[in-house]
Amino acid sequence: MSSIIVIGGGAVGLSVAYHLGKRCARDVVLLERHQLTSGTSWHAAGIVGPLRATPNMTQLAMYASDCFKTLETETGLSTGYKRTGGYWLARKADRMDELQRIV
């Protein structure tokens, strides 16, 4: 019997189970009806770009990107994640503010 059950093996469910296990709970069970990350998370194509509409979402995306490296170090397994870089253009001042937030 577990004290915590996480339902859904997508990006969010896996993250919740991982962080609960690291922080406080050693008996976390994750339930997924199909294959891990086979639902909505699969359709996201693994894109974790830092540019988001709010500062909090930008911070979360940057944390997620860093987490892939941590997972490889902790597990010794490759996540397959690659930082590829990119270009962003700003035609308006508010867009420039968003870009400066991630620099």
Protein language model features and the residues they cover:
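Short coil/turn connectors at secondary-structure junctions
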Residues: M1-S2, A25-R26, T84
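Beta1/beta-strand and adjacent pyrophosphate-binding region of the FAD-binding site
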Residues: M1-V12, V29
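N-terminal transmembrane alpha-helices
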Residues: V6-I7, H19, Q35, L51
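A secondary-structure boundary/capping signal
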Residues: I7-G10, E32, A44, R83-G85
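Glycine-rich nucleotide phosphate-binding loop and flanking beta-alpha elements
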Residues: G13, T37, R95
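Glycine-rich FAD pyrophosphate-binding loop
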Residues: G21-W42
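Dinucleotide-binding Rossmann-like beta1-alpha1 core, especially the glycine-rich loop
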Residues: G46-V103
